[in-house]
Amino acid sequence: MAWRVLWNLSSCDAVKMTIIRDALSTLTNTVIVPHSGWNNSSFDDDHKIKFQTSLVLRNTTGCLRNLSSAGEEARKQMRSCEGLVDSLLYVIHTCVNTSDYDSKTVENCVCTLRNLSYRLELEVPQARLLGLSELDDLLGKESPSKDSEPSCWGKKKKKKKRTPQEDQWDGVGPIPGLSKSPKGVEMLWHPSVVKPYLTLLAESSNPATLEGSAGSLQNLSAGNWKFAAYIRAAVRKEKGLPILVELLRMDNDRVVSSVATALRNMALDVRNKELIGKYAMRDLVNRLPGGTGPSVLSDETMAAICCALHEVTSKNMENAKALADSGGIEKLVNITKGRGDRQVQGDGAQGSY
Protein backbone atom coordinates (compact mmCIF):
# COMPACT_ATOMS: atom_id res chain seq x y z
CA MET A 1 0.00 0.00 0.00
CA ALA A 2 2.86 2.41 0.81
CA TRP A 3 4.21 2.06 -2.75
CA ARG A 4 0.83 3.05 -4.19
CA VAL A 5 0.73 6.13 -1.97
CA LEU A 6 4.21 7.16 -3.13
CA TRP A 7 3.20 6.55 -6.74
CA ASN A 8 0.24 8.90 -6.34
CA LEU A 9 2.32 11.51 -4.49
CA SER A 10 5.02 11.40 -7.16
CA SER A 11 2.61 12.87 -9.69
CA CYS A 12 2.62 16.14 -7.71
CA ASP A 13 5.42 18.44 -8.88
CA ALA A 14 5.69 20.13 -5.48
CA VAL A 15 6.86 16.97 -3.69
CA LYS A 16 8.90 15.18 -6.37
CA MET A 17 12.29 16.43 -5.17
CA THR A 18 11.36 15.68 -1.56
CA ILE A 19 10.60 12.08 -2.49
CA ILE A 20 13.87 11.84 -4.42
CA ARG A 21 15.85 13.25 -1.51
CA ASP A 22 14.19 11.16 1.22
CA ALA A 23 13.06 7.96 -0.48
CA LEU A 24 14.95 7.30 -3.73
CA SER A 25 17.71 5.23 -2.14
CA THR A 26 15.19 3.20 -0.15
CA LEU A 27 12.97 2.59 -3.17
CA THR A 28 15.97 1.44 -5.18
CA ASN A 29 17.53 -0.82 -2.55
CA THR A 30 14.36 -2.39 -1.14
CA VAL A 31 12.22 -2.70 -4.27
CA ILE A 32 13.90 -2.00 -7.61
CA VAL A 33 17.14 -3.95 -7.17
CA PRO A 34 15.75 -7.06 -5.42
CA HIS A 35 12.52 -7.31 -7.44
CA SER A 36 14.30 -6.78 -10.76
CA GLY A 37 16.63 -9.69 -10.09
CA TRP A 38 19.70 -7.65 -11.01
CA ASN A 39 22.84 -8.55 -9.04
CA ASN A 40 21.03 -11.32 -7.17
CA SER A 41 21.89 -14.81 -8.36
CA SER A 42 19.77 -16.41 -5.61
CA PHE A 43 16.58 -15.67 -7.57
CA ASP A 44 15.35 -18.81 -9.32
CA ASP A 45 14.42 -18.90 -12.99
CA ASP A 46 10.70 -18.89 -12.22
CA HIS A 47 11.05 -15.61 -10.36
CA LYS A 48 13.11 -14.08 -13.14
CA ILE A 49 10.44 -14.99 -15.68
CA LYS A 50 7.51 -13.73 -13.63
CA PHE A 51 9.05 -10.77 -11.84
CA GLN A 52 7.57 -8.30 -14.32
CA THR A 53 4.08 -9.12 -13.01
CA SER A 54 5.07 -7.91 -9.53
CA LEU A 55 2.61 -5.27 -8.41
CA VAL A 56 5.21 -3.68 -6.13
CA LEU A 57 7.71 -3.37 -8.98
CA ARG A 58 5.06 -1.95 -11.31
CA ASN A 59 3.98 0.67 -8.78
CA THR A 60 7.54 1.64 -7.87
CA THR A 61 8.69 1.98 -11.47
CA GLY A 62 5.60 4.12 -12.03
CA CYS A 63 6.75 6.33 -9.17
CA LEU A 64 10.26 6.58 -10.66
CA ARG A 65 8.77 7.46 -14.03
CA ASN A 66 7.01 10.44 -12.47
CA LEU A 67 10.08 11.50 -10.48
CA SER A 68 12.34 11.39 -13.54
CA SER A 69 10.34 14.23 -15.12
CA ALA A 70 11.12 16.65 -12.28
CA GLY A 71 14.00 18.43 -14.03
CA GLU A 72 17.77 18.46 -14.22
CA GLU A 73 18.56 17.96 -10.54
CA ALA A 74 16.14 15.04 -10.35
CA ARG A 75 17.78 13.42 -13.35
CA LYS A 76 21.27 13.88 -11.90
CA GLN A 77 20.34 12.32 -8.57
CA MET A 78 18.56 9.39 -10.19
CA ARG A 79 21.46 8.71 -12.56
CA SER A 80 23.89 8.64 -9.65
CA CYS A 81 21.74 6.33 -7.50
CA GLU A 82 23.67 3.08 -7.31
CA GLY A 83 21.92 0.15 -8.94
CA LEU A 84 19.00 2.13 -10.37
CA VAL A 85 20.00 2.37 -14.05
CA ASP A 86 21.42 -1.16 -13.97
CA SER A 87 18.17 -2.58 -12.58
CA LEU A 88 15.87 -0.72 -14.97
CA LEU A 89 17.87 -1.94 -17.97
CA TYR A 90 17.98 -5.45 -16.50
CA VAL A 91 14.18 -5.44 -16.35
CA ILE A 92 14.00 -4.46 -20.02
CA HIS A 93 16.54 -7.09 -21.07
CA THR A 94 14.70 -9.80 -19.13
CA CYS A 95 11.32 -8.82 -20.55
CA VAL A 96 12.72 -8.76 -24.07
CA ASN A 97 14.22 -12.23 -23.54
CA THR A 98 10.84 -13.56 -22.34
CA SER A 99 8.85 -11.79 -25.10
CA ASP A 100 6.98 -9.64 -22.58
CA TYR A 101 6.93 -6.42 -24.58
CA ASP A 102 3.72 -4.74 -23.47
CA SER A 103 3.59 -4.82 -19.66
CA LYS A 104 3.15 -1.68 -17.60
CA THR A 105 6.46 -2.36 -15.86
CA VAL A 106 8.32 -2.33 -19.18
CA GLU A 107 6.53 0.87 -20.15
CA ASN A 108 7.51 2.54 -16.86
CA CYS A 109 11.16 1.47 -17.16
CA VAL A 110 11.47 2.65 -20.76
CA CYS A 111 9.87 6.01 -20.04
CA THR A 112 12.08 6.53 -16.99
CA LEU A 113 15.19 5.73 -19.02
CA ARG A 114 14.04 8.09 -21.75
CA ASN A 115 13.94 10.93 -19.24
CA LEU A 116 17.31 9.98 -17.75
CA SER A 117 18.76 10.01 -21.29
CA TYR A 118 17.63 13.60 -21.81
CA ARG A 119 20.35 16.28 -22.15
CA LEU A 120 23.18 13.86 -21.37
CA GLU A 121 25.57 15.90 -23.48
CA LEU A 122 25.10 18.87 -21.15
CA GLU A 123 24.61 17.11 -17.84
CA VAL A 124 27.35 14.46 -17.77
CA PRO A 125 30.92 15.41 -16.72
CA GLN A 126 32.62 17.59 -19.31
CA ALA A 127 35.53 15.17 -19.63
CA ARG A 128 33.25 12.78 -21.50
CA LEU A 129 32.45 15.24 -24.27
CA LEU A 130 34.09 15.94 -27.62
CA GLY A 131 34.27 19.24 -29.44
CA LEU A 132 33.16 19.70 -33.04
CA SER A 133 36.66 19.31 -34.49
CA GLU A 134 37.18 16.08 -32.57
CA LEU A 135 33.79 14.89 -33.72
CA ASP A 136 34.89 15.44 -37.33
CA ASP A 137 37.83 13.12 -36.64
CA LEU A 138 35.49 10.60 -35.05
CA LEU A 139 33.28 10.54 -38.12
CA GLY A 140 36.27 10.37 -40.45
CA LYS A 141 35.92 13.86 -41.90
CA GLU A 142 38.94 15.72 -43.26
CA SER A 143 39.55 19.30 -42.19
CA PRO A 144 42.04 21.62 -43.89
CA SER A 145 45.23 22.09 -41.90
CA LYS A 146 48.94 22.75 -42.22
CA ASP A 147 51.91 20.89 -40.87
CA SER A 148 52.65 23.78 -38.55
CA GLU A 149 50.83 26.78 -37.19
CA PRO A 150 52.27 30.17 -36.16
CA SER A 151 52.13 31.12 -32.50
CA CYS A 152 53.67 33.70 -30.21
CA TRP A 153 56.52 31.23 -29.55
CA GLY A 154 57.33 30.69 -33.21
CA LYS A 155 55.89 27.78 -35.17
CA LYS A 156 53.90 25.21 -33.28
CA LYS A 157 54.18 21.71 -34.64
CA LYS A 158 50.89 20.03 -35.36
CA LYS A 159 50.07 17.14 -33.09
CA LYS A 160 50.31 13.73 -34.65
CA LYS A 161 46.96 12.67 -35.98
CA ARG A 162 45.50 9.57 -34.41
CA THR A 163 45.01 6.55 -36.61
CA PRO A 164 41.50 5.81 -37.90
CA GLN A 165 41.32 2.81 -35.59
CA GLU A 166 41.86 5.09 -32.62
CA ASP A 167 39.24 7.76 -33.26
CA GLN A 168 36.61 6.29 -35.57
CA TRP A 169 33.84 3.74 -35.08
CA ASP A 170 31.31 2.86 -37.74
CA GLY A 171 29.35 0.19 -35.89
CA VAL A 172 31.84 -2.62 -36.55
CA GLY A 173 34.48 -3.97 -34.19
CA PRO A 174 35.46 -2.73 -30.72
CA ILE A 175 34.53 0.81 -29.76
CA PRO A 176 37.59 3.00 -29.09
CA GLY A 177 37.99 4.04 -25.47
CA LEU A 178 34.76 2.39 -24.30
CA SER A 179 34.36 -0.09 -21.48
CA LYS A 180 33.21 -3.55 -22.51
CA SER A 181 31.32 -3.92 -19.23
CA PRO A 182 29.63 -0.58 -18.48
CA LYS A 183 28.05 0.00 -15.09
CA GLY A 184 25.63 2.50 -13.64
CA VAL A 185 25.09 5.71 -15.55
CA GLU A 186 27.49 4.65 -18.33
CA MET A 187 24.91 2.06 -19.37
CA LEU A 188 22.56 4.85 -20.46
CA TRP A 189 24.71 5.82 -23.45
CA HIS A 190 26.63 2.60 -24.15
CA PRO A 191 25.82 1.42 -27.72
CA SER A 192 24.72 -1.96 -26.33
CA VAL A 193 21.54 -0.23 -25.14
CA VAL A 194 20.41 0.19 -28.74
CA LYS A 195 19.43 -3.44 -29.33
CA PRO A 196 16.75 -3.79 -26.60
CA TYR A 197 15.20 -0.47 -27.59
CA LEU A 198 15.01 -1.61 -31.22
CA THR A 199 13.51 -4.94 -30.16
CA LEU A 200 10.75 -3.13 -28.29
CA LEU A 201 10.16 -0.87 -31.29
CA ALA A 202 9.82 -3.92 -33.52
CA GLU A 203 7.71 -6.09 -31.21
CA SER A 204 5.70 -3.96 -28.77
CA SER A 205 2.12 -2.92 -29.44
CA ASN A 206 2.02 -0.50 -26.50
CA PRO A 207 2.12 3.09 -27.89
CA ALA A 208 3.70 4.47 -24.70
CA THR A 209 6.50 1.89 -24.86
CA LEU A 210 7.03 2.65 -28.55
CA GLU A 211 7.16 6.38 -27.88
CA GLY A 212 9.53 5.89 -24.94
CA SER A 213 11.89 3.62 -26.89
CA ALA A 214 11.99 5.96 -29.89
CA GLY A 215 12.40 8.91 -27.52
CA SER A 216 15.35 7.23 -25.81
CA LEU A 217 17.11 6.77 -29.15
CA GLN A 218 16.14 10.33 -30.05
CA ASN A 219 17.78 11.70 -26.90
CA LEU A 220 20.87 9.50 -27.11
CA SER A 221 21.57 10.39 -30.75
CA ALA A 222 21.24 14.16 -30.24
CA GLY A 223 24.14 16.56 -29.97
CA ASN A 224 27.81 16.89 -30.86
CA TRP A 225 29.40 14.34 -28.59
CA LYS A 226 31.09 11.06 -29.31
CA PHE A 227 28.50 8.79 -27.75
CA ALA A 228 25.74 10.29 -29.87
CA ALA A 229 27.87 9.40 -32.90
CA TYR A 230 28.34 5.89 -31.52
CA ILE A 231 24.59 5.48 -30.99
CA ARG A 232 23.84 6.60 -34.55
CA ALA A 233 26.34 4.05 -35.89
CA ALA A 234 24.96 1.32 -33.61
CA VAL A 235 21.40 1.88 -34.87
CA ARG A 236 22.64 1.40 -38.41
CA LYS A 237 24.63 -1.70 -37.42
CA GLU A 238 21.59 -3.27 -35.75
CA LYS A 239 19.45 -2.52 -38.82
CA GLY A 240 17.30 -0.16 -36.79
CA LEU A 241 16.58 2.42 -39.49
CA PRO A 242 13.92 0.27 -41.25
CA ILE A 243 12.23 -0.32 -37.88
CA LEU A 244 11.97 3.43 -37.27
CA VAL A 245 10.77 4.10 -40.81
CA GLU A 246 7.98 1.53 -40.51
CA LEU A 247 6.67 3.26 -37.38
CA LEU A 248 6.18 6.47 -39.39
CA ARG A 249 3.11 4.73 -40.82
CA MET A 250 1.54 4.20 -37.40
CA ASP A 251 -1.72 5.94 -36.56
CA ASN A 252 -0.40 7.49 -33.35
CA ASP A 253 0.68 11.12 -33.29
CA ARG A 254 3.12 10.93 -30.36
CA VAL A 255 4.88 7.84 -31.68
CA VAL A 256 5.29 9.40 -35.13
CA SER A 257 6.68 12.58 -33.56
CA SER A 258 9.33 10.69 -31.54
CA VAL A 259 10.25 8.49 -34.50
CA ALA A 260 10.55 11.46 -36.89
CA THR A 261 12.84 13.31 -34.49
CA ALA A 262 14.91 10.17 -33.92
CA LEU A 263 15.35 9.85 -37.70
CA ARG A 264 16.34 13.52 -37.87
CA ASN A 265 19.09 12.86 -35.32
CA MET A 266 20.17 9.65 -37.05
CA ALA A 267 20.63 11.64 -40.26
CA LEU A 268 23.46 13.60 -38.61
CA ASP A 269 25.50 10.53 -39.57
CA VAL A 270 26.42 10.81 -43.27
CA ARG A 271 25.77 7.16 -44.06
CA ASN A 272 22.49 7.17 -42.18
CA LYS A 273 21.48 10.27 -44.11
CA GLU A 274 22.03 8.49 -47.42
CA LEU A 275 20.01 5.46 -46.30
CA ILE A 276 17.14 7.51 -44.88
CA GLY A 277 16.97 9.61 -48.03
CA LYS A 278 16.91 6.51 -50.21
CA TYR A 279 14.43 4.37 -48.26
CA ALA A 280 12.39 6.71 -46.03
CA MET A 281 11.72 9.82 -48.10
CA ARG A 282 8.29 8.72 -49.33
CA ASP A 283 7.20 7.71 -45.83
CA LEU A 284 8.21 11.11 -44.45
CA VAL A 285 6.49 12.98 -47.29
CA ASN A 286 3.34 10.84 -46.98
CA ARG A 287 2.83 12.11 -43.42
CA LEU A 288 2.64 15.72 -44.60
CA PRO A 289 -0.83 17.20 -45.22
CA GLY A 290 -2.30 15.80 -48.40
CA GLY A 291 -0.38 12.56 -48.11
CA THR A 292 -1.66 9.02 -47.75
CA GLY A 293 -0.95 8.77 -44.02
CA PRO A 294 -3.63 7.29 -41.74
CA SER A 295 -4.59 10.54 -39.98
CA VAL A 296 -3.97 14.27 -39.70
CA LEU A 297 -1.02 15.01 -37.44
CA SER A 298 -0.56 17.72 -34.83
CA ASP A 299 1.50 20.83 -35.54
CA GLU A 300 4.25 19.52 -33.24
CA THR A 301 4.51 16.24 -35.12
CA MET A 302 4.36 17.98 -38.49
CA ALA A 303 7.24 20.19 -37.33
CA ALA A 304 9.22 17.07 -36.37
CA ILE A 305 8.71 15.64 -39.86
CA CYS A 306 9.73 18.93 -41.48
CA CYS A 307 12.89 19.02 -39.34
CA ALA A 308 13.68 15.45 -40.39
CA LEU A 309 13.23 16.37 -44.05
CA HIS A 310 15.47 19.41 -43.58
CA GLU A 311 18.29 17.37 -42.05
CA VAL A 312 17.99 14.54 -44.58
CA THR A 313 18.17 16.92 -47.56
CA SER A 314 20.82 19.25 -46.08
CA LYS A 315 24.06 19.05 -48.12
CA ASN A 316 22.78 16.04 -50.06
CA MET A 317 21.65 16.64 -53.62
CA GLU A 318 20.37 13.10 -54.15
CA ASN A 319 18.06 13.36 -51.16
CA ALA A 320 16.89 16.82 -52.25
CA LYS A 321 16.02 15.35 -55.64
CA ALA A 322 14.17 12.47 -53.96
CA LEU A 323 12.15 15.02 -51.96
CA ALA A 324 11.13 16.76 -55.17
CA ASP A 325 10.37 13.50 -56.98
CA SER A 326 8.09 12.33 -54.15
CA GLY A 327 5.99 15.50 -54.26
CA GLY A 328 7.42 16.91 -51.07
CA ILE A 329 8.12 20.40 -52.41
CA GLU A 330 4.47 20.99 -53.31
CA LYS A 331 3.28 19.79 -49.91
CA LEU A 332 5.76 22.00 -48.07
CA VAL A 333 4.69 24.99 -50.16
CA ASN A 334 1.05 24.24 -49.35
CA ILE A 335 1.89 24.21 -45.64
CA THR A 336 3.42 27.68 -45.88
CA LYS A 337 0.39 28.96 -47.80
CA GLY A 338 -2.15 27.44 -45.48
CA ARG A 339 -0.33 28.43 -42.28
CA GLY A 340 1.45 31.61 -43.20
CA ASP A 341 1.21 32.99 -39.67
CA ARG A 342 2.86 29.95 -38.08
CA GLN A 343 6.49 28.91 -37.98
CA VAL A 344 8.29 25.73 -37.03
CA GLN A 345 10.09 26.46 -33.77
CA GLY A 346 13.40 24.77 -32.91
CA ASP A 347 14.58 21.39 -34.10
CA GLY A 348 13.12 19.11 -31.46
CA ALA A 349 16.38 17.23 -31.13
CA GLN A 350 15.56 15.91 -27.67
CA GLY A 351 12.49 15.38 -25.58
CA SER A 352 11.29 14.03 -22.22
CA TYR A 353 8.06 13.28 -20.48
Which residue ranges define each predicted feature?
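Extended parallel coiled-coil rod domains
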Residues: 50, 180-203
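Extended, charge-rich alpha-helical scaffold/interaction domains
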Residues: 134-135, 353
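Alpha-helical solenoid repeats of the armadillo/HEAT superfamily
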Residues: 1-10, 17-22, 26, 35-69, ...
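Residue-level signal for cytosolic alpha-helical hairpin/rod architecture
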Residues: 61, 72, 194-195, 228, ...
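Buried hydrophobic core positions in alpha-solenoid tandem helical repeats
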Residues: 6, 26-31, 45, 87-92, ...
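Eukaryote-specific, cytoplasm-facing alpha-helical/coiled-coil scaffolding segments in long proteins
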Residues: 88, 111-116, 135-146, 225, ...
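Leucine-rich repeat
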Residues: 13, 229-230
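Short glycine/proline-rich turn/loop motifs
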Residues: 43, 174-181
